[in-house]
């Protein structure tokens, strides 16, 4: 199977998992990126089975609306049963690196609200130790140099992602060459740097369920 076929398979598996648990008042949190887009396309076939969605980015909101799925602001939603999103890396404990698409802050907020966070990914994203994929950090622009210096002290090699502004108007610094053996601790340490909005480690709030697309089929991992 190609990577695209694996993404489509896990997206469909996520739809199959949540669909029996949805009703006409349900609102689904939806992530950002190519795998999340596959989920949106699969979910759209059942748009009459739920009320609408909360989007983690402007791009996701546009895709949902393009399918005729109502999009709600998170502040107007009191209950979010599911959040479905992809990942750049996951370890076996379902700690994640996310943010390759620069939507990490909104993704983290929606994940925090959701009762169940379902991560969907192809098998290449499961790694023994996080960090081969550069760790994205969202930063207030005026703090760029200060944050970069602090990231060096933490053992990373920070690289400014040129030409990218987040939906929140901030910049991204990607931290290379880190072997992340304690993701909960590192997430907190980076977030404590003044000028950091958040970073792409989802360890304080990891995924609850990982649907992994492999050549042998979709595998389900839980914490």
From Swiss-Prot:
Please give the biological process terms from Gene Ontology that the record holds.
D-ribose metabolic process; pentose-phosphate shunt, non-oxidative branch
UniProt-annotated catalytic positions: 107
According to the lineage, what is the superkingdom? Bacteria
Tell me the CDD domains matching this sequence. Answer: RPI_A
Q: Report disulfide bridges, numbered on this chain.
A: none
What general EC class does the enzyme of this chain belong to? isomerase
Where is substrate bound in this sequence? 32-35, 85-88, 98-101, 125
Provide the reaction this enzyme catalyses: aldehydo-D-ribose 5-phosphate = D-ribulose 5-phosphate
Q: List the Pfam families.
A: Rib_5-P_isom_A (PF06026)
Q: What EC number(s) does the entry state?
A: 5.3.1.6
Asked if the Swiss-Prot or TrEMBL record annotates the protein with the keyword Isomerase, the reply is: yes
One cellular-component annotation, GO: cytosol
Q: What does the record give under GO molecular function?
A: ribose-5-phosphate isomerase activity
Metabolic or biological pathway: Carbohydrate degradation; pentose phosphate pathway; D-ribose 5-phosphate from D-ribulose 5-phosphate (non-oxidative stage): step 1/1
What keywords sit in the KW lines? Isomerase
Family listed: Belongs to the ribose 5-phosphate isomerase family.
Q: How does it assemble?
A: Homodimer.
Free-text function comment from the UniProt entry: Catalyzes the reversible conversion of ribose-5-phosphate to ribulose 5-phosphate.
> What PANTHER family does the record point to?
RIBOSE-5-PHOSPHATE ISOMERASE
Q: What is this protein called?
A: Ribose-5-phosphate isomerase A
């Amino acid at each position: 199977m190609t990577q695209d076929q694996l993404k489509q398979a896990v997206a469909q598996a996520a739809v199959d998992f949540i669909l029996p648990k949805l009703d006409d008042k349900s609102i689904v949190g939806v992530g950002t990126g190519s795998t999340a887009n596959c989920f949106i396309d699969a979910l759209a076939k059942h748009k009459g089975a739920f009320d609408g969605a909360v989007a983690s980015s402007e791009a996701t909101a546009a895709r949902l609306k393009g399918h005729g799925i109502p999009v709600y602001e998170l502040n107007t939603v009191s209950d979010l049963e599911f959040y479905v999103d992809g990942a750049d890396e996951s370890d076996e404990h379902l700690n994640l690196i996310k943010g390759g698409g620069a939507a990490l802050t909104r993704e983290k907020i929606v994940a925090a609200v959701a009762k169940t966070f379902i991560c969907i990914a192809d098998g290449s994203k499961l790694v023994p130790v996080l960090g081969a994929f550069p760790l994205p950090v969202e930063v207030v622009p005026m703090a760029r140099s200060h944050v970069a210096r602090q990231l060096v002290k933490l053992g990373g090699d920070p690289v400014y992602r040129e030409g990218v502004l987040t939906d929140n108007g901030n910049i991204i610094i990607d931290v290379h060459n880190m072997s992340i053996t304690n993701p909960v601790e590192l997430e907190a340490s980076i977030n404590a740097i003044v000028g950091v909005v958040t970073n792409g480690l989802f360890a304080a709030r990891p995924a609850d369920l990982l649907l992994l697309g492999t050549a042998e089929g979709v595998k389900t991992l839980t914490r």
